[in-house]
């Protein structure tokens, strides 16, 4: 389960940033997770909370915002994947998106290259400092 090692890295970043800013407590951690990151948000959240026990991030709310894959086509189109392109109601097709190298361009119909959606970014950290108490 690679979610544990990812959660460890996120935890280290969060704690380091919180300490630099004099945090007494971490209230919220918000991540942007690409749909193609091959990371399970529920498992990542569970791992983060387990790692954070006994730390200033122990009670932090762990929020994951999903980023859709983005496309680029030789016709000049760039944009995000429309869920209807992959059969939103078909769970298997939706899961297979992680393994697809290209999708049909919504403008010209040719294969468009997937250029984004693999990100995993700590978007924001909300902390409590002594001044706020």
Swiss-Prot record:
**GO terms for biological process?**
protein maturation; protein modification process
- Any idea what this protein is called? Hydrogenase maturation factor HypA
Which domain of life does this protein belong to? Archaea
Residues that hold Zn(2+) according to the record: 73, 75, 105, 108
What job does the chain carry out?
Involved in the maturation of [NiFe] hydrogenases. Required for nickel insertion into the metal center of the hydrogenase.
The UniProt entry, under NCBIfam families, shows: PRK00762.1
| Entry keywords, A to Z | Metal-binding, Nickel, Zinc
Give the species this sequence originates from: Methanosarcina acetivorans (strain ATCC 35395 / DSM 2834 / JCM 12185 / C2A)
Q: Write down a Pfam family by its short name.
A: HypA
User: Which HAMAP family does UniProt cross-reference here?
Assistant: HypA_HybF (MF_00213)
GO-annotated molecular function: nickel cation binding; zinc ion binding
Supply the gene name.
hypA
Residues holding Ni(2+): 2
Q: Which family does it belong to?
A: Belongs to the HypA/HybF family.
PROSITE patterns xrefs: HYPA
């Amino acid at each position: 389960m690679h979610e544990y090692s990812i959660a460890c890295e996120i935890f280290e970043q969060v704690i380091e940033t919180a300490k630099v800013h004099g945090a007494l407590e971490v209230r919220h951690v918000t991540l942007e997770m690409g749909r193609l990151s091959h990371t399970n948000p529920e498992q990542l959240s569970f791992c983060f909370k387990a790692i954070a026990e006994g730390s200033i991030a122990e009670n932090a709310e762990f929020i994951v915002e999903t980023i859709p894959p983005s496309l680029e086509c030789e016709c000049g189109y760039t944009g995000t994947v429309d869920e209807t392109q992959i059969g939103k109601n078909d769970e298997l097709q939706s899961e297979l998106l992680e393994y697809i190298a290209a999708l049909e361009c919504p403008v010209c119909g040719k294969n468009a290259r997937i250029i984004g959606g693999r990100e995993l970014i700590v978007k924001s950290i909300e902390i409590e400092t002594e001044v706020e108490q």
